[in-house]
Swiss-Prot record:
Residues 423-435, 442-453, 560-574 have a biased composition (Acidic residues). Residues 1-89 form the CS domain. Required for the quantitative accumulation of H/ACA ribonucleoproteins (RNPs). This is Protein SHQ1 homolog. It comes from Danio rerio. Keywords: Cytoplasm, Nucleus, Phosphoprotein. Residues 421-461, 495-541, 556-585 are annotated as: Disordered. The modification Phosphothreonine is found at T536, T540. GO terms for cellular component: cytoplasm; cytosol; nucleoplasm. InterPro entries: CS_dom, HSP20-like_chaperone, Shq1, SHQ1-like_CS, Shq1_C. Belongs to the SHQ1 family. Residues 506-536 have a biased composition (Basic and acidic residues).
Amino acid sequence: MITPAFELSQDADFLIVVIRVPYTRTSDFDIYIQEEEFKFYAKPYFLRLTLPGRIVEDGREKASFDIDKGLFTLHVPKETAGQHFEGLEMLTSLLAPKGSRSAKPLVEDSEACGEGCEEEDEEFDWQIEQEVYTEAPADTLKEYHKYGFGNLRSGVFSRLQEELNEVIDMKDPDNTNAELRRRNRLDTETAVFCADHYLVNLYEDKEEIRNLLKFKPWWRKLNPDPSAGYDISMTFTEEEREQMRRFTNRSYLLDKKARFHVWLGLVDIILAYVYDVRTTEGEHNVESAWTIRKLSGTLSWLETYHSVQDVLVSFGRRTYCYPLYRHFSLVTLAVKDAACIFQAGKACILKCLLAIHKIFRENDPAYILNDLYITDYCIWIQRVKSKHVLALAEPLNNAKLQKNHLELELEIIEQAAELAVKEEEEKDTESDTDDSSSSSGDSDDEDDSDEECPEKAAEKKQTAFKAHAEAVTEAFCVELQRGDGRLIEELGKRLEEELTIEEDVPQERRSASEGEGERRREHYHPHAAESERDTTKAATGKELLDVCLQRKPLRILNTEELDSDDDDDDDDDGDLRITVVDERG
């Protein structure tokens, strides 16, 4: 027989059952309704449900069949109109037979069954008084070497040594008692804690942390009413419903202490899950399986807790040691998120557990944690009382977790960091002051240099001018040493006079001096030019176009370029030959 896919919903008067039976004959089906039991048969499908409320067959039943979709819809009257049936989303629990509500118990104990059922109805005192740990005798240590859901497993890791190191953080759990696991966990957390990573998140990643804190996960949109006293109705996807149908019904015979550990382990796992959802902003990634099992001491160290405060401290410490974002605001907000989920009821918790189950199922070898914890939690949570789930929301909402509870010296580290920041700021301030003083001194020096600059420039110019004049005069003397003495004297005087005029006249008065020099040249031209022409002609025997140095360029030719006769004449007479070229023609 095939168990068909189905969904349950309700209104004030009817229980609505939708069954998917695509391969059946619509004219051949049977329905059985009696008190809490509902049965449906249409070959080859068979469905049996044990309901949380009583139904009745009184003629108001309605049925319809959608041939295209293969959906069979039944409206079954409630015995008490207006009654709310809890847990209609818990498909695994509904499939269990009446009475045992289990296909095959995980642990059978016929004598303790009735007692166990009564204990499940007892109220939990979450402020239970803690007992001081005492070392157990050696002959009783074996009972502590268990782990898994309700400490019902042992010997699992002895068969899975290769996968051990990749799944949990401890070695040889089968031979390690609970107290030693805890000590080793605390020592490891203290050793791997990185103050630098924490300070980077605290001071440099403020924007990223702020965005994560603003993110609103799906459970924040539920707005559960604390006074309602029942679960919020949740919608499960087809994949989630299919996974619930695959679970095998089991009976968990747990004593009061074991059930207490199971509830605290559930809080620990949910905290790790909500942290991953927030830090990935609802988009689980390839690191999600690692993050969830690392943040949960239950999953990574097979830890068993003794109070809600123990769970919160462990979660806070591991949040500061392993994930990418390590910030106290993320820890406190994760606690509020977990409280919101427990306030919404067991259907909301089941949805979270199914998400974790899927993440681990798709990650090798994290699937081992499904076998040890998550699958059992998914089955167990469907059958617990809603009041126990809602009761856990209160201690989470009222939790007072502080940094000093984590025993990682966070406050000392922050104080040291603040002092370092202040010292750095003081150094920067002193450096800025020195820079401004230096800039002020440099500015004064520049002002003084700007005032002295014109005088120095004038002195340099005069010195260069004198050197140039002396060089030109010397060059003329060397070239004209064999020339007419009178011509040399006149040329030297004229050049000296012109250079003197250029030296004495300031830069801003050059235009006036140039005009005066032009007038002098005009005055000199009628007489001196004629005298120079006659003298040169007498010495060289050649007519010169113009010898006025103020108007025409003077070119002194090398005597080696002259004729040999001229050289002889020069040797005999000592006359100078000068050629003046008129560049106008």
